Amino acid sequence: MSELLNNTLVAYFSFTGNTRKLAENLAQVAHADLFEIVPKKPYTEEDCDWHNPESRTSLECNDSSSRPAIATHVPNMDQYRNIFLGFPIWWYAAPRIIETFLESYDMEGKFIIPFCTSGSSDIGDSALILQRDCDGKVVTGSRFEPDVFKGDLARWAIMQKFYK
């Protein structure tokens, strides 16, 4: 599998730790590098109150031009051809910080494979939205439970069609 996934990065944003756990497991089974997308201004519980239409995440999700700043940077993005991109589903889509990440790099010639965590929502139209933000090829992706069996995760990773 390591030959198949050569030059592969698992990049993720996690608020509660669920996506982090999934990303760590995916990086392990895929023999890929791991990168955490860290917001410049960390999110708080209050920021993520979806019941409050004035919460930070509610405002971001309702503003298609919102691009939360990122504190971390992949120093060697050119070496990666395949990028697993993990995030929680917020308001039925990827958080805006994922769009910031994609727009921060030249993704032309890269294969983007989204994966997400959610208490109830599926990945929805996230791939279509993310495709607008980069020149790479974004596939539909999948939603997982954070404690998915590593063997199932490995099988899913192998089934993706990667750039060589």
What are the language-model segments listed below?
Residues 1-82, 92-94, 99, 103, ...:
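N-terminal beta1-alpha1-beta2 submodule of the flavodoxin-like/Rossmannoid cofactor-binding fold
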Residues 12, 87, 115-116:
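Short beta-strand->loop
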Residues 113-151:
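Short, glycine-/small-residue-rich phosphate/pyrophosphate-handling segment
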Residues 100-106, 133-134:
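A glycine- and small-aliphatic-rich helix-loop capping segment at beta-alpha/alpha-beta transitions
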Residues 8, 87, 142:
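Generic anion/oxyanion-binding catalytic loop in active/binding sites
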Residues 15-17, 41, 89-92, 119-122, ...:
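Solvent-exposed loop/turn segments at secondary-structure junctions
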